[in-house]
Each structure stands twice: as structure tokens, then as C-alpha cells.
Amino acid sequence: MAEMKTADIRAMSEDQMDDAILSLKKERFNLRFQRATGQLENTSRLREARRDIARIKTIAAQKRAGKTK
């Protein structure tokens, strides 16, 4: 999965965001496992996945804060 753009994330529903976070967490787990066994070729993908998760969580929190105001 390529780096996610904020515009794409903002267009997602909360359920889609939850699904995206879950799939990114699974991907991160697999990437960490590959790194530990020496099979990981694209080491920057670990950082991208971590930041994508943070980006989605941030936008989800902003959406929730906007609904409560």
C-alpha cells in the first residue's frame, strides 16, 4: 500500500478508517517480522506504515471533535 494522502483519508467513513488502520497494523507486524529475519528489502515502508496509522488516527479524532462541537 502506498503512502496515503490526507484528502483520501478525509473522504473515508469511520468504518473505512478502522479497516485501514487494522490492515496497516497487520502490514506493520509482517514488516517487523521480515526485518527480524533479514528478509525486508524496503525498510522505509515500516516508517510509512507507522505514519499512515498516525495520520488516519489524527484525522479520525479531528472528525470526532468536529461532530461534538
Curated annotation (Swiss-Prot):
Q: Which domain of life is it from?
A: Bacteria
Q: Name one GO cellular component term.
A: cytosolic large ribosomal subunit
Q: Name one GO molecular function term.
A: structural constituent of ribosome
Q: Check the record and name the InterPro entries matching this protein.
A: Ribosomal_protein_uL29, Ribosomal_uL29, Ribosomal_uL29_CS, Ribosomal_uL29_sf
- GO BP, sorted A to Z: translation
UniProt keyword list: Ribonucleoprotein, Ribosomal protein
What Pfam families does the annotation carry? Ribosomal_L29
Database matches in PROSITE patterns: RIBOSOMAL_L29
Family of this protein = Belongs to the universal ribosomal protein uL29 family.
This chain belongs to the protein called Large ribosomal subunit protein uL29
Traced from the root, the source organism's taxonomic lineage reads: Bacteria, Pseudomonadati, Pseudomonadota, Alphaproteobacteria, Hyphomicrobiales
